């Protein structure tokens, strides 16, 4: 995930200004966010290989009974837990670099039947409604489903890098949930021969308890599993 494409057009971050400028800093922020989510993304990629999973999902995949979700064309689910509201209109500059003076907010639909957390503020919203949220250039509207268990890591700068700190297991209360963390060597195809490990996490909302399942499997160079649990308030 996360690779810009084009023909005879600039794609590298340094083509969009210098560090400290609006566009450069926005791109850098989301590059770092992508690596922050790498344990989550990598686990979903494992599910794609082993279970024919779909990472980028129409809202109807998970909310087939929500009629309003059928009309939403600029949102998608990223795995089971994240709702991404793509900003599909220019907010800063128009044709020929004309400056646009418009509100930096975006309206998002939150599917019914669950609670949603604003990823940036942790504010909670009931599903089944449209909400207007801040959407400056460095903040794509992202919502997290109640019951989500999201593994993240700090300090990563490439996909197969081993985290220096324990993987954080972020829990968003409000419903039961589960997530399977997938791990392998990260730089070869040994997983096709069984060299990988999975760990199932379960959140019991009524008890406020996160269950850490047994780590199943192994691969060369596998480190001892150490996790840090964070419960979002």
Question: What would you call each of these model-derived segments?
Answer:
Residues 137-233:
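Accessory, solvent-exposed terminal regions and/or long lumenal/extracellular loops of proteins
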Residues 1-138, 181:
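Catalytic-domain carbohydrate-binding cleft regions of carbohydrate-active enzymes
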């Amino acid at each position: 995930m996360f690779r810009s494409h084009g023909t005879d057009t600039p794609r590298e971050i340094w083509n969009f200004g210098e560090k400290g400028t609006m566009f450069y800093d926005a791109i850098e922020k989301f590059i770092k966010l992508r690596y922050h989510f790498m344990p989550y993304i990598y686990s979903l990629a494992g599910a794609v290989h082993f279970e024919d999973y779909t990472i980028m999902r129409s809202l109807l995949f998970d909310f087939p009974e929500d009629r309003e979700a059928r009309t939403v064309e600029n949102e998608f689910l990223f795995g089971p837990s994240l709702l991404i509201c793509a900003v599909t209109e220019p907010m800063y500059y128009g044709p020929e670099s004309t400056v646009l003076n418009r509100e930096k907010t975006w309206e998002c639909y939150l599917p019914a039947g669950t609670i949603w957390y604003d990823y940036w503020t942790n504010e909670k919203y009931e599903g089944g409604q449209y909400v207007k949220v801040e959407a400056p250039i460095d903040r794509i509207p992202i919502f997290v489903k109640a019951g989500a268990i999201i593994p993240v890591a700090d300090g990563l700068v490439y996909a197969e890098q081993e985290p220096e700190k324990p993987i954080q297991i972020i829990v968003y209360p409000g419903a039961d949930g589960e997530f399977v963390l997938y791990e392998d060597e990260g730089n070869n195809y040994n997983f096709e021969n069984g060299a990988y490990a999975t760990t199932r996490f379960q959140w019991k909302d009524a008890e406020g308890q996160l269950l850490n399942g047994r780590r199943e499997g192994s691969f060369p160079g596998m480190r001892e599993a150490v996790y840090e649990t964070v419960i979002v308030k």
